[in-house]
């Protein structure tokens, strides 16, 4: 949906990991390998990062990998006939028509939290698009928020893994059109996991 380019394979691999609990024996190495692969992909000629900006952004900046930020979640899916259509504002002021697929509920830092999951109207991918902001937004992380892509689970077992949170393309290149997280996805905790802003 919002991946594109050769980064698609990297993010799909990470999203697939988000539908099952992490195996701590290889969890950290799996995340580290995916991050290295993304850095390599972003050095290609056809990525959002312009050649002149690659030294500024690469390698990408991350919080340390922390399995505590990979939390089990329940997913309440809205029936297709009852799915709300939402006009999501974007970085280029061209609203996106999104469909609210359902809600992920989980406990983190002792708080019960919820995130709405979406996909773009007409999109047939088997992933949940979860844009969010948190108490690090505009400080250690991109002020406009970060994204998660979570694979749909046939078993109903979901893991929200914030170690896989990534910046939208408009962070690297303002010509890209990126949806802004809705108000309902503003988390009241600091998500010190996933991608940061350069130099933080």
Roles of regions detected by a PLM:
Residues 79-143:
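Mid-length scaffold segments of soluble, non-membrane domains
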Residues 130-166:
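Acidic, glycine-rich flexible loop segments
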Residues 14-16:
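C-terminal motif of bacterial Sec signal peptides marking the signal peptidase cleavage site
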Residues 84-88, 153, 184:
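Terminal leader/tail segments of proteins
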Residues 138-140, 157, 165-200:
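Extended, aromatic/histidine-rich regions of cofactor-dependent oxidoreductases associated
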Residues 30, 35-103:
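N-terminal secretory signal peptides
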Residues 18-20:
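Bacterial signal peptide processing site
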Residues 1-7:
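Bacterial N-terminal signal peptides that target proteins for export
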């Amino acid at each position: 949906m919002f991946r594109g380019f050769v980064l698609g394979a990297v993010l799909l691999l990470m999203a697939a990991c988000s539908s099952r609990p992490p195996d701590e024996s290889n969890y950290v190495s799996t995340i580290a390998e995916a991050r290295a692969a993304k850095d390599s992909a972003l050095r290609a000629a056809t990525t959002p990062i312009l050649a002149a900006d690659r030294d500024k952004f690469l390698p990408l900046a991350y919080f340390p990998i922390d399995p505590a930020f990979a939390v089990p979640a329940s997913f309440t899916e809205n029936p297709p006939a009852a799915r709300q259509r939402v006009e999501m504002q974007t970085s280029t002021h061209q609203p996106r028509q999104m469909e609210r697929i359902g809600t992920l509920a989980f406990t983190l830092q002792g708080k019960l939290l919820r995130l709405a999951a979406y996909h773009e109207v007409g999109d047939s991918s088997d992933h949940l698009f979860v844009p969010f902001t948190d108490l690090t937004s505009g400080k250690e992380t991109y002020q406009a928020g970060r994204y998660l892509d979570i694979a749909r689970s046939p078993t109903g077992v979901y893991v929200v893994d914030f170690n896989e949170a990534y910046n939208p393309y408009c962070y690297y290149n303002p010509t890209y059109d990126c949806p802004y997280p809705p108000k309902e996805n503003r988390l009241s905790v600091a998500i010190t996991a996933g991608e940061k802003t350069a130099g933080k």
